[in-house]
Amino acid sequence: MRPHGRARDAMREIKLEAGVSVYAEGSCLARFGGTHVLCTASIEESVPPWMRGGGKGWVTAEYGMLPRATHTRSRREATAGKQSGRTQEIQRLIGRSLRAVVDLKALGERQITIDCDVLQADGGTRTAAITGAWVALKQATGYLIEEGLLTSDPVHGQLAAISCGVIDGETRLDLEYEEDRRAEADANFVLTDTGGIVEIQATAEDKPIPETDFDLLFALAKAGVVDLCEAQLAALKG
């Protein structure tokens, strides 16, 4: 039995709220059940030094968790003086995923930074961050068009992300923390609305994942991403 009685192919309650920040050019509060991630998009009219003069823009991301986003308080990484390997891995994943659906040349020599701050964590923070980040990015490029700084949208595709796993021999969609911590295998899928693969991270804990189980996880993820993409568009429409 899954927590809250969910079916194996059921996601948690998904809520995506766009435009939650009065200052950022784009923003989205992504709620995947008990996981809440605030994503904000900020536009800078410059690019990193190594990109100057190249005629292309850049999309990057930063990720972090509030100290009490989890059951016990975690020390702020700024206080520790360095980011954890996990933080660096996740923010690179977010940026890399978003760049897969952006025409950087069409963006022009400007940078969009997506800040993903985990307010509350109950599993799937990176997938919630990617899903909310796309909404914030779309709002930001919409702002550039409204301001006359762009004539067309450089975001040429839609994507979202979801977690899956094998628990007690059963393949399940959208794991929460209690499931994730005892999963025999878990995977994160970043997919486009048309089923294109942007990134897949899959790990076996006790024994290798049979191909049949992976195929089941992939099928669950594809169905979940379709629903997430619909939620993204609904959020942008307000």
From Swiss-Prot:
The keyword Transferase applies. It catalyses: tRNA(n+1) + phosphate = tRNA(n) + a ribonucleoside 5'-diphosphate. It comes from the Bacteria. Transmembrane segments: none annotated. GO terms for molecular function: 3'-5'-RNA exonuclease activity; tRNA binding; tRNA nucleotidyltransferase activity. InterPro entries: ExoRNase_PH_dom1 (IPR001247), ExoRNase_PH_dom2 (IPR015847), ExoRNase_PH_dom2_sf (IPR036345), PNPase/RNase_PH_dom_sf (IPR027408), Ribosomal_Su5_D2-typ_SF (IPR020568), RNase_PH (IPR050080), RNase_PH_bac-type (IPR002381), RNase_PH_CS (IPR018336). Phosphate binds at R86, G124, T125, R126. This is Ribonuclease PH.
